[in-house]
C-alpha cells in the first residue's frame, strides 16, 4: 500500500483528489471540523510541526489505506501495512519524547491519514463478509417492460467514497461544516471523554459495514431509496472521523 502524502498549503489553495477516503471537499471538511475542536495548545503544536494549520493540510493521493477485521468484526491485525497498525505506530511516535521533529511531523501526517481512512466504510475489510470490492446495481422504482428504468452500475467502495457526496455536488467544505455543526450539537463533550482507541474506531466502522451489507450485497439490484436510507451510516462515520482526529491530537500533542 502506498500511503497518502501530504502537503501543507494555503487554505484556499488546497491540493487534493477525489480518490481518498471521501471526496476532496469532504476530506477538507473533516480536517476543518476537527480543527474547530482542537485546544489552543494543540493548534499551536500542529502549526509548529507542519508550518501551517491543520485545516490547510492537503491530501495527494497515492492509494487508500485499508484495515482488516476478523469475521466477528474485531480488530486483531498485526499487518504492518494495515491502517490501524500504522496509526498506532504514529501515535507512539507522537507520544515519544525521543522522536525528532521530522519524525513527529511524519507521524502527524500519518495519523491524520489513517484516522480518516479507517472511518470510511470503503476502506473496511472483514474476513468472510467483506473481503473485496463488489458491483451493485441501483435503480428507481419505474420499470419499462421487464427492465428496470435507469439502472446504474456502481460498487461498494464507490458508494462510500462518492455516491452520497456527488448528490451534494455543489456543497463546499464550509457548507458541510454548517450542517455538521447542527447535526452534532452537544456531542463534543462525550467524544472528548473517550480514549484514543484506533481499534475500537475500526470496529465501529465494521459494525456500520455489517448494517449496510444487509442491503448492499454483491451484484444486488437495489432501489435508489434503499441506498439513500443508508446515508446516516456515512454521516455518522464523518462525525466520528472529525471528533476522533481532534481527540487524538489533543491527547498526543502535549
Per-range role (PLM):
Residues 16-18:
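N-terminal signal peptide c-region/cleavage motif recognized by signal peptidases
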Residues 10-13, 35:
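Short, linear, compositionally biased motifs with a strong N-terminal bias
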Residues 115-123:
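Hydrophobic, aromatic-enriched interface-forming segments
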Residues 1-8:
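Bacterial N-terminal signal peptides that target proteins for export
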